[in-house]
Design a protein with these regions (language model features):
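Walker B beta-strand of ABC/ABC-like P-loop ATPase nucleotide-binding domains
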Residues: 1-5
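Basic, amphipathic alpha-helical bundle interface domains used for macromolecular binding and assembly
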Residues: 6, 11-210
Length: 210
């Protein structure tokens, strides 16, 4: 499910996403009763940093007032943002980068790493019914399968003490760090894996938890 211009959707419509994102199911209630259906899906959402779209732009000036920026961001509730695993800020691409012939990691190489990581996860979770990948790992099993180095534990503890993350964010950070480690071919979660996972929670800090 791709939602472009996320803040332009009604608050009511966005809040309905909270249950399926959390539980993988949706409950429909009517006067005659209610029914629950499976609702596993991948949510991808995009939005501008502000109404005019230029907040933080290196060359264009933002025309929004601070109150307008805050009002725009408040269209996305903290509980919904808390249920989104990855927050990625896309900066404008410089001309030199577009014109450069130097490429990064190829799509084929990335695909090979993802296939290997998914195979590793299927093997790891054979004893857990209904769990085939890190995203499905229940909270009760996180500490068992997401073992951290002391340095990684220190980073995670410091982030929670400074930023006041929720228990839900804790679970999601560990699952993302587990995936980063799998892509890196590491069984232990080290400082680099936790640091990368924490970088993907940047909107929690900018938007605040509402």
């Amino acid at each position: 499910l791709f939602l472009d211009e996320l803040p332009e959707f009604s608050r009511e419509s966005l809040e309905v996403l909270r249950q399926p994102l959390e539980d993988g199911q949706i409950t429909v209630s009517r006067a005659a009763g209610s029914a629950t259906y499976p609702s596993h899906f991948q949510l991808v959402a995009a939005m501008n940093p502000c109404k005019c779209g230029y907040l933080g732009h290196p060359t264009r000036e933002c025309t929004c007032t601070p109150s307008a920026v805050d009002a725009y961001r408040r269209r996305i509730s903290g509980p919904l943002l808390d249920r989104i695993d990855l927050h990625v800020e896309a900066l404008p691409v410089e001309y030199d980068d577009l014109a450069s012939e130097q490429g990064g990691e190829s799509s084929a190489d990335v695909r090979a790493r993802v296939i290997a990581a998914r195979a590793l996860q299927r093997e790891r979770y054979q004893a857990l019914p209904g769990v085939r990948c890190n995203a499905q790992l229940p909270s009760s099993a996180l500490r068992r399968y997401c073992r951290m180095t002391p340095a990684a534990e220190k980073i995670l503890r410091g982030a929670f003490e400074r930023l006041g993350y929720s228990a839900r964010a804790y679970d999601r950070i560990l699952r993302v760090a587990r995936t980063v480690a799998d892509l890196d071919g590491s069984e232990l979660l080290d400082a680099a894996h936790l640091s990368e996972a924490l970088q993907y929670r940047s909107l929690d800090r900018k938007f605040g938890m509402r």
